[in-house]
From Swiss-Prot:
GO terms for biological process: mitochondrial electron transport, ubiquinol to cytochrome c. It is a single-pass membrane protein. This is Cytochrome b-c1 complex subunit Rieske-3, mitochondrial. The chain crosses the membrane at residues 106-128. It is found in: Mitochondrion inner membrane. Its EC number is 7.1.1.8. The Rieske protein is a high potential 2Fe-2S protein. Binds 1 [2Fe-2S] cluster per subunit.
Length: 268
């Protein structure tokens, strides 16, 4: 019962205070003269309205510019808001360095000069690398043609040149060699082939110097048939490069070649 009575009393008191506040006219303006009352301006009404609520807090709820108070701004913000062409430098923040020690100038000179030489060397290497990269590769050079001078080759001798990474045998045959190559019975050959099919000029025999067995290099002017002998597994080739004895299955390969002049041979 006591709690209910207390709640009724508190609610009735709040109702009376609020009704008293709203029944009171805080915005009444009177003039000292007997002139009729004037209607208040909006600015005065706002000021009086704010004055009614100032008692509810320790500080005024009005903005700082209405109360005449100006807060301090940082220097950077103040400079942005108030730009000026008069720039004042603070000399206290500038540090002056004394001139260098004369005894260390020679060392600095040598260090800088050495650095320039190093940079120049690096630039030179980069340029050389770029230029060399534009040249033909080894694979391209290997596929190029090879020109051979035949004037220095004596009859009955064999010379070896390198073409496409492989040795090429060039033999200048004598009349006896030519007759011996043509007198062979094709039925006795493992890889039958006439001598005329392997040469363009009977005097010159051009074959790739790689054994057709396992890729060894045969020895010229050797073997049982006066041609080539493979020391790896004992294959014998005759004066026309045909296999006559041993494990090799095929004759020595004949590359693509042509005679440019009487004593000029172009391989490839």
């Amino acid at each position: 019962m006591l709690r209910i009575a207390g709640r009724k009393l508190s609610s009735s008191a709040a109702t009376r205070s609020s009704s008293a506040f709203f029944t009171r006219n805080p915005f009444t303006f009177t003039d000292d003269s007997s002139s009729p009352a004037r209607s208040p301006s909006p600015a005065s009404l706002a000021s009086q309205f704010l004055d009614q609520f100032r008692g509810f807090s320790s500080n005024s709820v009005s903005p700082a510019h209405q109360t005449g108070l100006v807060s301090d701004l940082p220097a950077t913000v103040a400079a942005i808001k108030n730009p000026s062409s008069k720039i004042v430098y603070d000399d206290s923040n500038h540090e002056r360095y004394p001139p260098g020690d004369p005894s260390k100038r020679a060392f600095a000179y040598f260090v800088l000069t050495g650095g320039r030489f190093v940079y120049a060397s690096l630039v030179r290497l980069l340029i050389l690398k770029f230029v060399l990269s534009m040249s033909a590769s080894k694979d391209v050079l290997a596929l190029a043609s090879l020109e051979v001078d035949l004037s220095s080759i004596e009859p009955g001798t064999t010379v070896t040149v390198k073409w496409r990474g492989k040795p090429v045998f060039i033999r200048r045959r004598t009349e006896e060699d030519i007759n011996l190559a043509n007198s062979v019975d094709l039925g006795s050959l493992r890889d039958p082939q006439q001598d005329a099919e392997r040469v363009k000029n009977p005097e010159w025999l051009v074959v790739i110097g790689v054994c057709t067995h396992l890729g060894c290099i045969p020895l010229p002017n050797a073997g049982d048939f006066g041609g080539w002998f493979c020391p790896c597994h004992g294959s014998h080739y005759d004066i026309s490069g045909r296999i006559r004895k041993g494990p090799a299955p095929y004759n020595l390969e004949v590359p693509t070649y042509s005679f440019m002049e009487e004593n000029k041979l172009l391989i490839g």
